[in-house]
Design a protein with these regions (language model features):
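Surface-exposed helix-capping loop/turn segments at secondary-structure junctions
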Residues: 95-104, 177-181
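Short, solvent-exposed loop/turn segments at secondary-structure junctions
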Residues: 19-21, 39, 108-111, 119, ...
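A short linear hydrophobic-aromatic micro-motif
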Residues: 14, 99-103, 136-141
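Conserved core segment of the aminotransferase class I/II
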Residues: 5-85, 173-174, 178
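Conserved PLP phosphate-binding loop immediately N-terminal to the Schiff-base lysine helix
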Residues: 1-3
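Short hydrophobic/aromatic beta-strand micro-patches
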Residues: 33, 113-115, 154-156
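PLP-dependent enzyme catalytic core of the Aspartate aminotransferase-like
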Residues: 128-137, 143-185
Length: 185
């Protein structure tokens, strides 16, 4: 069943744009597919049209280039998927080796969640990685995770950079003195 197909008597809004479709987050062009019962759909489209005209103009350069970008979108998405898979493998190889860190399972996306020992706050982990190693991660609380200590790592970086960042986590772990009771397990 297509995600664009109407589901019963409800309106279904499917959002997309150049950011995800063509790997171009800096080029602001998005669209909404509206499905559902004709009267509700038509009213929603009228309102969306007004909002788009009033608040969401698309720049002429983006309009001019959009067709070419979309024609190349499949190749870009394929390259992004390959890079994300390779970066994930590099991260898994280093941080899932049975030590005090682990990469949590995921079902997709271009970020990984790394669980580290709760010897310091997520913020302290992030700050230490940045100041000591130049490695940028985000603390899990940015994403409203309810448990500590989680770090969110971008998988869009080159696999060798992700591997280097993982090595920095392990190096930093060596400098933290902690009792094994504080391990993540």
């Amino acid at each position: 069943v297509s995600m664009l197909a109407p589901q019963g008597d409800a309106l279904v809004f499917t959002l997309s744009g150049l950011s995800k479709a063509a790997g171009l987050p800096q080029m602001k062009l998005g669209w909404i597919h509206v499905a559902g019962p004709a009267p509700l759909r038509d009213e929603a489209l009228e309102r969306l049209d007004w909002i788009a005209d009033a608040y969401l103009p698309v720049g002429a350069p983006v309009q001019h280039a959009a067709a070419r970008w979309l024609a190349r979108a499949h190749d870009v998405r394929t390259a992004i998927c390959s890079r994300v898979e390779a970066s994930r493998a590099a991260l898994d190889c280093r941080l899932n080796a049975g030590g005090a860190t682990r990469v949590l399972p995921s079902e997709g996306g271009w970020s990984a969640i790394v669980q580290v020992p709760r010897v310091h706050s997520e913020e302290e982990w992030a700050l230490q990685l940045l100041s000591r190693h130049g490695v940028l991660v985000q603390p899990g609380y940015f994403y409203d995770f309810s448990t500590e200590a989680l770090l969110v790592v971008s998988l869009l970086a080159a696999p060798e950079d992700v591997a280097s960042g993982a090595d920095a986590v392990l190096d930093l772990l060596k400098t933290f003195s902690f009792d094994r009771r504080w391990s993540i397990l």
